[in-house]
């Protein structure tokens, strides 16, 4: 039978159209699906394989969203002395609502036997992992995706790195395919490891920086700063977080990057009532102690927002490739290519909006 006449399920259909797309389209697809990895930039086959495997996660979410009408998205960021997390709910219209957003210190309540800190004993790390899951507030009646990231700074000592690594592995294992209640036929708790490179690319890589950095009075040699510099990316991510919060607070919703804040959240952010634009500090807005705390909270916020936007993009791609039950069609291939191109342009347009705020940022 001709390949054109073969019907396919979703993932094989996506794989087919990825095979037929050119390399440039695949690179753009990796960006809009929050999966861009620099070391795949010269080889089509491993990039396609990686993208299709990533789509498997979002296919599970998409299916649950169709069935249940809502899903919960979580992002967790582990450090040696705390964890930050963000929870958002996405409905079947891809409306995204902020539900929870906290930074929790690893105090004595995360340790056993009245110890003041988490030890590397299995009983301690397992206890801490289960406590993290209980704090997240997963719903037994909804599908919950938990994206997990850990601190990777070279400045952290070996034991601290080891603790974060162990907690990351245990949290992933505890969340992957868990049946929250014994009567559920489908796993309600899913897990994914969040690569910080994906977050940086999705929110930062297309941001024009050169002109704005030249006009920044705090920078004496703008050429010394490049997009790959951690300080530049951290600054852009802070700007993006403030943009999204301001838009949500003012109900000035970008249809592609919308976030809903209910009245309760708006009362928690009084500084947004007394300021305009981005003239506020995330540290003060979130009542945090340090800039590092604000950076950690930014990371989980943007990771969760990225997941919600990628889920929408992925679902639209599925609608395209399944128009004729997954059959190969030149018209569908053109729609596939055009959609990927347009979504990248939309992302580029959004990122360009961050550029002007770099002029006054402290870098």
UniProtKB/Swiss-Prot annotation:
- Give a GO molecular function annotation for the protein: Y-form DNA binding
Q: Name the major location.
A: mitochondrion
Where does the UniProt annotation locate this protein? Mitochondrion matrix
Keyword Lipid metabolism in record? no
Xref: InterPro entries: Mrs1/Cce1, Ydc2_cat
Any one cellular-component term (Gene Ontology): mitochondrial matrix
List this protein's GO terms for biological process: Group I intron splicing; mitochondrial genome maintenance; mitochondrial RNA processing; mRNA processing
Q: Which Pfam family is an annotated match for this chain, by its short name?
A: Ydc2-catalyt
Q: Does the keyword Mitochondrion apply?
A: yes
Domain of life of the organism encoding this protein = Eukaryota
Q: Which UniProt keywords apply?
A: Mitochondrion, mRNA processing
Job description of the protein: Function in mitochondrial RNA splicing in the excision of mitochondrial group I introns aI5 beta from COX1 and bI3 from COB transcripts and thus would be involved in obtaining the correct structure of the intron, to allow the RNA catalyzed reactions to occur.
Note in the entry: Present with 5240 molecules/cell in log phase SD medium.
* Subunit-level organization: Homodimer. Forms a ribonucleoprotein complex composed of maturase bI3 and 2 dimers of MRS1 that assemble around the bI3 RNA.
| Identification of the protein by name | Mitochondrial RNA-splicing protein MRS1
Q: Which organism is it from?
A: Saccharomyces cerevisiae (strain ATCC 204508 / S288c)
Recite the lineage of the species. Answer: Eukaryota, Fungi, Dikarya, Ascomycota, Saccharomycotina
